[in-house]
Amino acid sequence: MSALKDRLADTGYGLGWGLLCRLPESWVRWAFQFAGDIAWRRQGHGVQLLEANLRRVIGPQPSGQELRQLSRDAMRSYARYWLEVFRLPVITKERLLDGTLGIGESALHAILASGRGVVAALPHMGNFDAAGAWIVSTGVGKFTTVAERLKPESVYLRFVAFRESLGFEVLPASGSNSRFGVLAQRLRAGGLVCLPSDRDVTGGGIEVEFFGEKARMMGGPAALAVQTGAALMPVTLWYEGDYWAVHIHQEIPVPDGGDRREKVAAMTQQVAGVFEAGIAAHPADWHMLQRVFVADLDPERLAAAEAAAEDTAEDDGGRP
């Protein structure tokens, strides 16, 4: 059964990239919105987690109707993301440039032009892939990111090929102890690294205050900035009607005091603050169908992941 599911998943993604980009966009947009509505009505595990996360965003005691409407809007936004993923290979550079509302890109370009690297930390908002294709189109050139190893492997390889076609260099998010070193090399060479950071996927993340609760986020972007001298710049994304919106925020400086871990923790907390403001302004475009808040995490799995992360950090020179 597992092998059959893997083949079906691979076939589905293959059809997505091979067929959907050839159909009229209005048809496909309607179909994906309809699919998003169906997923929302079914109230599966992912939608339940989405609503648990959004409940923190919109207040301590949101009405059931308010939360349900927001989660429906969020699932439609998420469906739009997937529609655009399958159609991005045929979207022209001109449409990307004309269809993106960019804020703060001049500061990013200025830092890169000075020869200094930039590590951009992003939440799961809007459309990461469209934003990446846009920044490549503005003249930045190729940048480096990581991708979770999806199963089956064939689907992961399709995603890597897709993102490479947009101008990304893609490293696996797991299975390679040299990943941090490669990212550091790119930054020391004056390159751009873009990392999704609003969910801890390693068990070794940083605990932050987020919407009034404890949450765990990736400390890698801040650690890379501290180690390499690169600029740490949070980025928030959302949809503005038919447009993509990309806000590249001001650099978060490395604190003067404290040891390395304290600096990384303080900078990650500042990133979380930027994410919080961006998500609060555009909650329907935060596509977080996973556990983020510590209260929602399984204690035993969290403890095991933390132990594994500590072992990895020791093997990797103490890097988070």
Locations of regions flagged by a protein language model:
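Membrane-anchoring hydrophobic helices of lipid-metabolizing enzymes
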Residues: 1-122, 156, 165-167, 315-316
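Short amphipathic alpha-helical segments and helix-helix/interface helices
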Residues: 105-109, 132, 136, 159-160, ...
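Catalytic core of membrane glycerolipid acyltransferases/transacylases, capturing the structured
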Residues: 114-175, 189, 203-206, 210
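A conditional alpha-helix N-cap/helix-loop micro-motif detector
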Residues: 98-101, 125, 152, 173-177, ...
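Non-catalytic C-terminal accessory region of glycerolipid acyltransferases
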Residues: 2-4, 8, 39-42, 60, ...
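Generic structural marker for isolated residues within well-ordered, non-membrane alpha-helices
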Residues: 16, 51, 132, 159, ...
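Short, composition-biased local secondary-structure segments
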Residues: 20-23, 127-133, 153, 183-198
